[in-house]
Amino acid sequence: MIVAVASRNPNKLRAVQAAYKLFGMRAQVVPVEKPVSLPPQPIGVETVVAGAIERARAALSVVQNAEHGVGIEAGVLQAGGRYLDVTVAAIADRNGVVTIGFGPAFQVPDIFLNDVLRGVELGVLAERYFGRVAIGYKEGIIGVLTKGVVSRFDLNMAAVVMALVPRLSTNAPLYRF
């Protein structure tokens, strides 16, 4: 199956490939540019989810022979009086169905929080602080914070896996599409 992904980030592309493979689905991943209307640092759960959905629909519209369009969006949400970075994946299909999934979330480091809430991308702040180039295309800030135990790939893959759950044939009776 051809799967269009609204990103050129290798972490996201590999995560989509791996998530589909986990369920025995053969996916030919086709990267496309993300929509220009997306904010650099989405804040709020609805904004993050909307960004993932917009990416998924845009990818599907660009690649005419794709069965699925996938959007992966990382952003910040508030819970329990804290701010968390979360990854959300959305999968759109030709029937207009969109499924979503969340990856694990981690607390945004306090030293970055004010800038993040002003719209500065967490990855940019992490690159400056840790002196690493293109951190979001590599291990991500989570990779640095966990000393490589968890990577951005892991967060992306988990979100895509969760978005695939309603699409598994064994789960068809459980969902109304």
UniProtKB/Swiss-Prot annotation:
Origin superkingdom: Archaea
Reaction catalysed by this enzyme: XTP + H2O = XDP + phosphate + H(+); ITP + H2O = IDP + phosphate + H(+)
Enzyme class: hydrolase
Cofactor needs: Mg(2+); Mn(2+)
Keyword terms, alphabetized: Hydrolase, Magnesium, Manganese, Metal-binding, Nucleotide metabolism, Nucleotide-binding
Coiled coil spans: none
Annotated EC: 3.6.1.73
Pfam short name (any one): NTPase_I-T
A Gene Ontology biological process term: thiamine metabolic process
Cofactor stoichiometry and binding remark: Binds 1 divalent metal cation per subunit; can use either Mg(2+) or Mn(2+).
Cysteine-cysteine disulfides: none
GO molecular function terms attached to this record: ITPase activity; metal ion binding; nucleotide binding; ribonucleoside triphosphate phosphatase activity
Record note on quaternary structure: Homodimer.
Entry function: Phosphatase that hydrolyzes non-canonical purine nucleotides such as XTP and ITP to their respective diphosphate derivatives. Probably excludes non-canonical purines from DNA/RNA precursor pool, thus preventing their incorporation into DNA/RNA and avoiding chromosomal lesions.
Membership in a protein family: Belongs to the YjjX NTPase family.
HAMAP family, per database record: Non_canon_purine_NTPase_YjjX (MF_00648)
Protein name: Probable inosine/xanthosine triphosphatase
Natural source organism: Pyrobaculum islandicum (strain DSM 4184 / JCM 9189 / GEO3)
Lineage, highest ranks first: Archaea, Thermoproteota, Thermoprotei, Thermoproteales, Thermoproteaceae
